[in-house]
């Protein structure tokens, strides 16, 4: 059986110079983020908020002094009841003290549980659809051990200047405020009021509305009118310097506001162009920045890596890879959030891929291929591991830099090659704007559904292999060129690194044919081992081939083996021309008469049959009006052996098929 062969002309040579520093920094980013999140993700960490209500709105009023690790204030929640109930349950650390809970002005009874929940009791049963609000007044020192460690941090910077910041992914929000802390509910909007000593500035989500003086303190007000997950809410307070500017994106002007340690202000200002260019680039590919009606911002904090707080990424430095990675999360992680930590690649794989896109398109295309090669070497440095997270209780597994970040990003590279740019980006935009997903939660199945809709392809095999499956293939390509017709024959086989998980990877494998400066790339759609392919004469004598030289697929230890006399004796053969024409011969092998079917041809065509010594045995010349033609070749008087049937179209392109008697 033969498969379709696609020919693509290429006219450039790839550089081989490596730039390991960027590769190392990208891996270090993933590892530092893993360490950042490690403290807040343990086997016992989970949201225990009740499922009988959803939160519509939060109004958070907090008192913060960055010199003291302490919080007091209130959180008012507007909610809608989904199941008749007389109580609702919030997530809240048992270490914080709840002073009172009020339904408007009425005090409600409540109880704090050892499992870090706050149970609120109503005097009557609330019916489904009932919308109401409660205010929780509380105070205390947030826990800093176990799975809450690192979620509410007080430290210093510069000349011993106090700074306080939060980082709540994945379950750290409940350490410092009452909320629904799971991946099943987003508040439609939020207002945040932070009262702090007047010598400091506060940073948080959304638009900075006002700074109201209150004697020795100031109340900073932020408002955010987009749906937001609890773990994406963040605050920081210190003596920030503020850098504000406007970034033009098409017909929109998006404010960029940065809160930076004074000692680092110049560095951030000198690198703001990176954020500006990335905002414009990502908007051109994935649609306008998701929170364009408000702003984007960066806040400096003192933890390794960064955190994609919605509209306001917390970053530890003004480095290109970190800033572009966290910005990418605003589309992938914030606008559309993974609905399970098993699908963390929908956040981290995408953000890693976007940072790679920025580098190759805006910084330096010369070093992009060595960077891809470095990523590939890192991914295949171990034989196993899936992008799908099979153990969400392990922080090392959830935030695995090799699998969730790098292999996740490479999965997108493979999808882009498999689908083509048009269908790939169309599908990603559909995913981001899917009414069921936009400003909500998504699964890998949701991404697959939108990519299939955009491309018309069934991608079950792809996600079964590359998302759920472990490992990678090693390809062996045997090849030879016919000295008479010039056509090139291939036999492709593969071995997989974890055959018990994936015994064969179906791929559209690029093969580059080369002879000095002459190069053509063909794509072999590999569906099974030892599959045979025939390629029409590429127009030059092929000296060598390269297997997936641009690294569109994860693979390792590939081998190309030249066999000049490679011949086939398979039963059914198709060989498209440059325009996609096909020759089908049946039966094959033949005894008396062979039926030849031409498809996707038009205009004048010529068919010639040659025996194994190159002698012409039969010919046909005529016009094709309906893009297909069927005719018969009498083989009764021909000697046993192999024959070449060569099709020449009106534009001069040729295809050929082998017929065996």
Which residues make up each language-model segment?
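N-terminal, polar/Ser/Thr-rich
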Residues: 18-72, 157-162, 459-461, 465
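Glycine/proline-rich low-complexity spacer/linker segments in large multi-domain proteins
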Residues: 45-50, 128, 137-190, 551-571, ...
């Amino acid at each position: 059986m033969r498969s379709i062969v696609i020919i693509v002309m290429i006219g450039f040579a790839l550089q081989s110079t490596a730039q390991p520093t960027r590769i190392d920094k990208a891996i270090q980013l993933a590892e530092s983020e893993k360490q950042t999140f490690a403290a807040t993700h343990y086997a016992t960490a989970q949201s225990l908020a009740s499922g009988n209500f959803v939160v519509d709105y939060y109004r958070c009023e907090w008192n913060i002094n960055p010199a003291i690790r302490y919080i007091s204030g209130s959180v008012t929640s507007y909610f809608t009841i989904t199941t008749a109930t007389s109580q609702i349950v919030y997530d809240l650390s048992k270490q914080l003290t709840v002073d009172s809970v009020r339904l408007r002005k009425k005090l409600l009874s409540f109880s704090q549980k050892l499992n870090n929940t706050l149970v609120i009791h109503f005097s009557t049963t609330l019916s489904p659809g009932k919308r109401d609000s409660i205010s929780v007044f509380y105070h205390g020192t947030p826990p800093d051990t176990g799975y809450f460690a690192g979620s509410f941090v007080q430290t210093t910077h510069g000349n011993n200047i106090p700074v306080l910041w939060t980082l709540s992914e994945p379950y750290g929000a409940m350490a410092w405020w009452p909320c629904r802390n799971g991946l099943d509910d987003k508040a439609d909007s939020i207002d945040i009021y932070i009262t702090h000593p007047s010598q400091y500035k506060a940073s948080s989500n959304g638009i900075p509305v006002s700074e109201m003086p209150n004697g020795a303190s100031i109340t900073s007000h932020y408002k955010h009118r987009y749906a937001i997950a609890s773990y994406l809410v963040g605050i920081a307070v210190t003596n920030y310097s503020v850098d504000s500017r406007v970034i033009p994106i098409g017909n929109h002007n998006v404010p960029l506001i940065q809160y930076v340690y004074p000692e680092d202000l110049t560095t951030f200002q000198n690198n703001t162009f990176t954020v500006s260019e990335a905002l414009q680039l990502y908007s051109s590919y994935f649609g306008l920045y998701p929170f364009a009606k408000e702003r984007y911002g960066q806040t400096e904090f003192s933890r390794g890596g960064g955190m994609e707080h919605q509209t306001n990424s917390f970053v530890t430095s003004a480095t290109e890879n970190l800033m572009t990675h966290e910005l990418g999360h605003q589309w992938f992680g914030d606008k559309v959030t993974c609905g399970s930590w098993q699908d963390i690649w929908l956040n981290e794989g995408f953000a890693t891929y976007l940072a790679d896109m920025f580098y190759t398109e805006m910084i330096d295309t010369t070093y992009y291929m060595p960077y891809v090669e470095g990523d590939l070497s890192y991914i295949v440095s171990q034989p196993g591991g899936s992008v799908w997270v099979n153990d969400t209780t392990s922080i090392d597994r959830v935030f695995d830099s090799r699998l969730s970040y790098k292999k996740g990003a490479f999965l997108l590279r493979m999808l882009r090659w498999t689908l083509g740019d048009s269908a790939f980006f169309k599908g990603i935009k559909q995913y981001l704007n899917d009414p069921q997903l936009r400003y909500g939660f998504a699964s890998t199945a949701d991404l697959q559904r939108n990519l299939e809709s955009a491309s018309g392809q069934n991608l079950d095999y792809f996600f079964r292999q590359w998302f759920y499956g472990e490992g990678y293939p090693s390809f062996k390509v045997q090849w030879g060129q016919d000295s008479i017709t010039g056509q090139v024959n291939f036999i492709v086989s593969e071995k997989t690194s974890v055959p018990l998980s994936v015994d064969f990877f179906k791929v559209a494998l690029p093969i580059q044919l080369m002879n000095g400066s002459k190069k053509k790339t063909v794509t072999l759609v590999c569906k099974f081992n030892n599959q045979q392919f025939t390629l029409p004469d590429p127009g030059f004598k092929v000296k060598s081939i390269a297997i997936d030289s641009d690294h569109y697929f994860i693979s390792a230890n590939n081998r190309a083996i030249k066999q000049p006399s490679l011949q086939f004796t398979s039963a059914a053969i198709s060989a498209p021309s440059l325009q996609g024409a096909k020759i089908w011969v049946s039966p094959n092998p033949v005894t008396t008469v062979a039926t030849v079917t031409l498809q996707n041809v038009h205009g004048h065509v010529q068919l010639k049959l040659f025996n194994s010594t190159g002698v012409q045995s039969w010919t046909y010349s005529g016009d094709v009006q309906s893009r297909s033609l069927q005719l018969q070749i009498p083989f009764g008087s021909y000697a046993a052996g192999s024959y070449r049937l060569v099709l020449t179209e009106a534009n001069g392109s040729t295809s050929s098929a082998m017929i065996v008697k």
